[in-house]
């Protein structure tokens, strides 16, 4: 009986979330329809500040009120990894470039991923953006910054507090520092 009640409750939560969010983001391991998984809890918790109070109202997927996203249309990610948008203090700036987040990639709190910078000669202007690509199963440590044009290969680990200024497309490595450099291969 309890299992049936839980399924009915999840069904109503699903219908409620489908009204407010795009259905393509309500799938995957975070949104299991057999039990009340973390995705459903996070979507309900974010609904009021996001959709009623108006914080990031236009974004079609649930995000924490502590996350800043500039131009969500230029961000590509797996619906299994929606939890990256609940990591507090993260900043995703995709104004003049795209951000690709590979499947299984984890982004810790207070990370920044940016695709463009200001022009050094005229700070009111931005230079042309460059795409940022994070491979599959990467781990971006807390307080790290990924700068425009960076591409990280699969299974790259970025140490906490790192500033990644260049690409490490070979993957399977640990990088850290400011600027980030390869520490070791995995």
Predicted segments, located by residue:
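Domain-scale signature associated with acetyltransferase and cell-envelope carbohydrate enzymes
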Residues: 1-115, 120, 136, 154, ...
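Glycine-rich hexapeptide-repeat left-handed beta-helix
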Residues: 109, 116-130, 134-136, 142-186
């Amino acid at each position: 009986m309890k299992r049936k009640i839980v399924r009915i409750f999840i069904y109503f939560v699903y219908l409620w979330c489908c009204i407010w969010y795009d259905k393509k983001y309500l799938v995957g391991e975070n949104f299991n329809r057999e039990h009340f998984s973390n995705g459903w809890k996070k979507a309900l918790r974010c609904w009021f500040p996001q959709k009623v109070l108006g914080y990031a109202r236009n974004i079609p997927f649930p995000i924490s009120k502590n996350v800043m996203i500039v131009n969500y249309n230029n961000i590509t990610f797996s619906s299994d990894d929606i939890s990256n948008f609940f990591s507090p203090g993260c900043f995703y700036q995709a104004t003049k470039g795209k951000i690709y987040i590979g499947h299984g990639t984890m982004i810790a709190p207070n990370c920044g991923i940016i695709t463009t910078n200001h022009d050094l000669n005229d700070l009111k202007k931005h230079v042309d953006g460059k795409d940022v690509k994070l491979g599959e199963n990467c781990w971006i440590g807390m307080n790290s910054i990924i700068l425009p044009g960076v591409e990280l290969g699969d299974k790259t680990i970025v140490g906490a507090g790192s500033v990644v200024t260049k690409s490490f497309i070979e993957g399977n490595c640990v990088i850290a520092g400011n600027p980030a450099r390869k520490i070791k291969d995995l």
